[in-house]
């Protein structure tokens, strides 16, 4: 069965973007190394992403394991759904109370569903034995509250935003995590991975 991993790059104070949806220096580490994340046709879509050797040893296997991504409508709108070619995987599920945009890549088999549990179920089916990568934010916070998240993964960048879009969204209640099973210092990024305590 697939593993659901809540993931994003995050500031030290827990934000995945500022109040205006700008990421500032959060993604700088994706471009400060010598190891390209993508090769072949993927490199044509994401040509300049090269990370440090240390980060590559963690990020590349993780990205290669992703079978399906789940995003909220806000991220979908910001990225235009990556033009139906999400980074690191073939499948995408969008959680939204609004329908698929008219004319948006009619050839793409991208489900739009308004229920988080249903979205995770569809994503698990599409991912097979692969990872379901759940983008951090409000939808992921709901999934964590519903007990649908197996792992919380953060790429922490040394910047303080002060305010913005929260990694866990508007999360209710306390959720215990296990001790991290990954703590890896990259170049201007700290990779952390916490299994969710059951």
Question: What are these regions, as identified by a protein language model?
Answer:
Residues 2-146, 158-198:
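Portal/gating segments that form or line small-molecule/metal binding sites
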Residues 148-150:
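Short acidic amphipathic segments
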Residues 153:
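A mobile, often basic/glycine-rich helix-loop segment
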């Amino acid at each position: 069965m697939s593993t659901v991993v809540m993931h994003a790059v995050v500031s030290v104070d827990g934000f995945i973007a500022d109040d205006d949806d700008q990421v500032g220096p959060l993604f700088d580490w994706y471009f400060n190394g010598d190891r390209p994340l993508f090769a072949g046709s993927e490199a044509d879509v994401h040509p300049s992403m090269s990370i440090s050797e240390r980060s590559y040893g963690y990020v590349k296997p993780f990205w290669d394991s992703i079978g399906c991504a789940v995003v909220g409508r806000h991220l979908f709108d910001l990225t235009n759904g990556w033009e139906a070619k999400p980074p690191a995987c073939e499948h995408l599920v969008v959680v939204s109370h609004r329908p698929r945009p008219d004319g948006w890549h009619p050839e793409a088999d991208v489900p739009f569903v308004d229920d988080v549990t249903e979205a995770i179920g569809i994503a698990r089916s599409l991912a097979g034995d692969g990872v379901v990568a759940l983008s951090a934010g409000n939808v992921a916070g709901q999934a964590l509250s519903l007990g649908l998240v197996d792992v919380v993964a953060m790429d922490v960048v040394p910047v303080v935003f002060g305010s913005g879009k929260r990694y866990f969204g508007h999360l209710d209640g306390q959720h215990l995590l296990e001790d991290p099973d990954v703590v890896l210092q990259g170049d201007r990024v700290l990779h952390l991975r916490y299994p969710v305590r059951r």
